[in-house]
A protein has these predicted regions:
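Alpha-helical transmembrane spans of integral membrane proteins, capturing the lipid-embedded, hydrophobic core
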Residues: 47-48, 52, 69-77, 109, ...
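Intramembrane alpha-helical segments
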Residues: 100-172
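Topogenic membrane-insertion module of multi-pass membrane proteins
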Residues: 1-2, 7-10, 14-86
Length: 241
């Protein structure tokens, strides 16, 4: 099949445009699809799940499970991903208003920090050190501060996998149990597999690799995220029922 020049450049744009990613809705306006896509909902679902793991590793209260879930949704799902779009050297989402992204990020962080501070001052002081560390990684990793020194797999595993589990336990009982530590290790390992697979996936797409090659990585990403999210639902039902 011989492609015209316009077809060729269209395909090149689609290959580099994040709107063509598997986690972006295929329906709706461009702004709607961008707004949903930039949240990386499957990955956000993972980090929220890890926070729930932490809560379920100790004696828990349903209201606090909801609170820690919302905290991480606003902090990571919205704020971190918006800051990542700002800090990225490339513009995979196209030219988005920096002002709007900063406003959304600040509002989201204000909500998440308000939730965290409420429970930290109430009876969960362990949220203070966890929040400080998470806050550091949120800016250092996503905005690639300090010449990108902290934009690496280790920072991702700590902030995305391990600390959310600790935070989930801390908001419930202000303690870190043996079960919490075990679950944090599992979450850290899952996060490592996710980020390694994600990087390989992006490289293959950027190199215009054969569809079957990067589709395998895409399938792995779907399996990892769905396994964690579905597993969390089953874990919750087992503990709740």
């Amino acid at each position: 099949i011989i492609l015209s020049i316009s077809d060729y450049f269209y395909l090149k744009i689609m290959e580099s445009d994040r709107l063509s990613e598997w986690f972006v809705p295929k329906f709706g306006s461009r702004n709607f699809r961008l707004s949903i896509g930039i949240l990386f909902l499957p990955y956000t679902g993972m980090v929220v799940s890890f926070a729930i793991w932490g809560s379920l590793s100790v004696e828990y209260d349903l209201n606090r499970i909801v609170a820690i879930g919302l905290l991480y949704f606003f902090a990571i799902g919205i704020a971190a991903h918006c800051l990542d779009a700002l800090g990225s050297k490339k513009k995979p989402w196209g030219h988005i208003s920096h002002r709007k992204i900063w406003i959304v990020s600040i509002i989201s962080l204000a909500i998440s920090f308000s939730i965290g501070l409420h429970y930290a001052f109430l009876d969960s002081w362990l949220l203070f050190p966890i929040g400080i560390i998470e806050g550091f990684f949120l800016f250092a990793y996503n905005l690639e501060l300090f010449k990108g020194k902290f934009h690496n797999d280790t920072s991702f595993v700590i902030s995305w996998g391990i600390l959310p589990v600790f935070a989930g336990a801390a908001i419930q009982s202000n303690t870190i149990s043996i079960e919490t530590i075990i679950l944090s290790a599992i979450a850290g390992f899952a996060s490592y597999i996710l980020i390694i697979t994600s990087r390989k996936y992006k490289i293959l797409k950027q190199q215009n690799a054969n569809y079957e090659m990067y589709y395998k990585k895409e399938t792995m990403l779907k399996i990892i995220t769905s396994t964690v999210i579905i597993g969390t639902v089953l874990f919750f039902l087992a503990r709740y029922l």
